[in-house]
């Protein structure tokens, strides 16, 4: 009788069950190793992402500071009160809150509003510092500062600068369509522009300029009421008037800070943080 040929399995000294167990253990080890390597890779990616986020945050901070500084320089060239832009930001934030806007948007608006006149950096000093009436041509050039401001900051993908560009372009629009540079009217004017229009008007007329003295606060409040529905959005005016006492207190506080800071520190620090 011829002996039956043995298969490789018959020649393997390791019992089938034990062999299967070893294969499973090896597979589990390889899986564990792969999992560890994947976790390490994820950890490295997380570190890289954190470093990237920090770098982006730093760049955005420097970018914001550069634009704030540019707004300050435009303000100084125009002969504005040293904290004009900071006050505009503070008033705008208060008005937005009175309108029921979110705290996040109010904070964003407060920062963005401070760059409303950044476009004046592109207007010649002879026009900005002129004490007499502007000629027709000078006035035409002056009315370009909203477009200039929007061109400077409006192309950014950062929310603060996007809103600042929107404000720069629209804060001289009138509710009745008689403003500039686009001739927008009503709700076609972005809310931020409608808010800053009131804040800017109030602050500009309650502080001295090279060509006129400041008007009494209550006189300016009456002027804003008279322009309700014409130059200014009725709802924004109503919101402003509902917090008029708070606006007055904020103005007085910032005027005092301006006086103290100007006497002791100068204007080279974080001036926009005094609000």
What is each stretch, according to the model?
Residues 3-8, 29, 36, 43, ...:
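Metal-dependent catalytic cores of enzymes that make or break cyclic nucleotides
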Residues 68:
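Short FAD-binding loop at a beta-strand-to-alpha-helix junction that anchors the flavin cofactor
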Residues 7-61, 65:
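Amphipathic alpha-helical coiled-coil "transmission" helices that mediate dimerization
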């Amino acid at each position: 009788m011829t002996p039956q040929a043995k298969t490789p399995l018959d020649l393997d000294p390791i019992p089938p069950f034990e062999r299967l167990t070893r294969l499973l253990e090896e597979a589990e080890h390889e899986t564990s190793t792969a999992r560890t390597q994947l976790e390490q890779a994820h950890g490295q990616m997380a570190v890289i992402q954190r470093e990237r986020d920090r770098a982006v945050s730093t760049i955005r901070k420097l970018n914001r500071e550069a634009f704030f500084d540019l707004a300050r320089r435009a303000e100084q060239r125009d002969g504005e009160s040293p904290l004009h832009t900071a006050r505009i930001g503070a008033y705008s934030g208060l008005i937005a809150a009175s309108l029921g806007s979110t705290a996040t948007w109010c904070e964003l608006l407060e920062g963005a509003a401070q760059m409303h006149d950044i476009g004046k950096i592109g207007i010649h000093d002879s026009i900005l510092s002129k004490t007499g009436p502007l000629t027709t041509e000078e006035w035409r050039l002056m009315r370009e500062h909203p477009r200039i401001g929007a061109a400077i900051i409006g192309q950014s993908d950062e929310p603060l600068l996007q809103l600042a560009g929107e404000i720069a372009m629209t804060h001289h629009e009138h509710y009745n369509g008689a403003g500039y540079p686009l001739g927008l009217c009503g709700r076609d004017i972005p809310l931020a522009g409608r808010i800053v229009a009131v804040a800017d008007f109030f602050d500009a007329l309650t502080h001295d300029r090279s060509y006129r003295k400041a008007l009494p606060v209550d006189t300016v409040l009456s002027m804003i009421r008279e322009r309700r529905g014409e130059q200014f959005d009725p709802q924004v005016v109503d919101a402003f008037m509902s917090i008029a006492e708070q606006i007055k207190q904020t103005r007085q506080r910032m005027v005092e800070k301006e006086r103290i800071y100007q006497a002791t520190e100068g204007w080279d620090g974080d001036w926009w943080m005094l609000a």
